[in-house]
Amino acid sequence: MARRTKVRIVCAIGFLCAVSLSAQEVVRDTITGKVHQIEKVTVTARRLPNKVTSSVPIQTLSQQDISQLGIQNMADAVRRFAGANVKDYGGIGGLKTVSVRNMGAAHTAVSYDGVVVSNCQAGQIDIGRFSLDNVSVLSLNIGQPEDLLQSARMYASAGVLSIETEKPHFENERNSAFRVQMRGGSFGYVSPSIRWWQKAGSRTSFSLNGNYMRADGNYPFTLVNGKYVTEEKRNNSAIYTYQIEPTLFHTFKDSSNLELKAYYFYSKRGLPGSVTLYNPISDETLWDENVFIQTRYKKDFSQKWSLQAQAKYNHGWNKYEDKGNEYADGLYRAVHRQDEYYLSATALYRPWNV
């Protein structure tokens, strides 16, 4: 018994020594007791509007929401917003407008990267021509926008549909990124698109987005004429559209931002018209072309003072053509052209921060 007791005492002493030795090997914490500086962190995502503190109703759809819901075009995305009235004037490639409060599309502004899109001839904006491939945030304000740093055009509208495109961001220290997509559907619908991001320096990046869409639209339908029932096809429904959009992003040393964007859109579409008995001929054609160059500059002088300046040149052109014996030369043609120069500057002063 005495020998066993001695063995136990020796083991206990050895265990305590091991514990004390291991405690002495613990290195002191070097995190606390001094200030540490981390490397610069760059945030590339668009800032979402604050729905909680907003004084007006605001609804948003992020790029992730659009992908999860399987939305394929701008009109379907805007239909997700409560209170938005989207009118479709012709299916694939047709005019699509948005309005709020039943005041008409002329009273709803469409903002593309912070600059209002305009069409002086029609008075309403076709949202169907904008692609969802490079959209980062889509938001709808019913009333005045929450962001006070806006132009007078946006304040004069009953509602604002804001489209913010995606800003280039690079993973794994890459200097470029490239993506190709292809969509397809019924009646000859094909729509390929490309996206190219390129880093031009530590403060400068470049993006190029382009897409092409074509469709026949000659879907079949049943025509009932008394006791005669025939199977017909919709004629003169083909559409071809091209869109290209280069954008330059630059951040200055004082953290001010500059965005320079160019946009080109061209479309040629047939106008099928109404179904007329014994007359399937339809020769109406519409061409549309839109080019604009816009720039936006934002700078925060302090926590109280901010400045935003915008400049834009917009060129619109469309041509309508119809063939028929009712015209003097068998052809009717109408061409419309519009050019617009736009400049806006807004200063914001915050007496206090809440």
Where are the regions that the model predicts?
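A beta-strand signature from Gram-negative outer-membrane beta-barrel systems
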Residues: L132-R179
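N-terminal periplasmic "start-of-domain" segments of outer-membrane beta-barrel proteins
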Residues: Q37-S67
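Outer-envelope beta-barrel architecture signal
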Residues: T108, R174-F178, R183, V190, ...
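Residues on the lipid-exposed face of transmembrane beta-strands in outer-membrane beta-barrel proteins
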Residues: P192-Q198, P246-H250, I293-K299, L343-Y349
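Flexible loop and strand-edge segments within Gram-negative outer membrane beta-barrel domains
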Residues: G217-F221, E231-Q243, F249-T251, S255-L307, ...
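Extracytoplasmic beta-strand/coil segments of soluble accessory domains associated
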Residues: A75, R79-V116
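Transmembrane beta-barrel architecture of outer-membrane proteins
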Residues: L95, I125, A158, N175, ...
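Transmembrane beta-strands of outer-membrane beta-barrel pores
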Residues: T165-K167, M182-S186, Y212-D216, Y264-K268, ...
